[in-house]
């Protein structure tokens, strides 16, 4: 498998595109992350194969839970919920962050740029299997320094599990996380 995630990823949207061909046939999340939410929704219960990528003491190997754990390292306290709009070719992403007033989930548009921008990268790395290739452009975009360092750690752990990762970055924090 091969995934390329461009620097100009989708920002927060009111809904995201579905593509059964890209998501099921090609196992792609889109060069701009446009199918990341659909991929996560349709593969949420699959187990992560790369043991090196598994998050800390988290007992669940489910894809969605592992993605949430890693997103939580980059943007603390995040949980996700996908809302399928039935026969539409669109799907919604709802986000909850610990510390928000109330226990509500909010649309991606109402929680800032970082989560939407980083989700395709985290998903690509967590779902990757040994022998796959991932090319990432500017994974540090819209992340604070700690989030950039954690992104570097995630990249390094994917590579330790046999995933070939090519990264174009201008961030010392990403490089420090990889070390």
Predicted regions and their residues:
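The start of beta-strands in P-loop NTPase/AAA+ ATPase cores
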Residues: 132-133
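Phosphate-coordinating catalytic segments in nucleotide- and nucleic-acid-processing enzymes
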Residues: 1-118, 124, 129
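Active-site Asp-x-Gly
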Residues: 109-112, 148, 153
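C-terminal lobe/lid and adjacent interdomain/linker elements of RecA-like ASCE P-loop ATPase modules
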Residues: 150-179
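Short, charged/polar micro-motifs that form catalytic or ligand-binding hotspots
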Residues: 57, 105-108, 141-142, 164-168
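Walker B catalytic motif
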Residues: 136-139
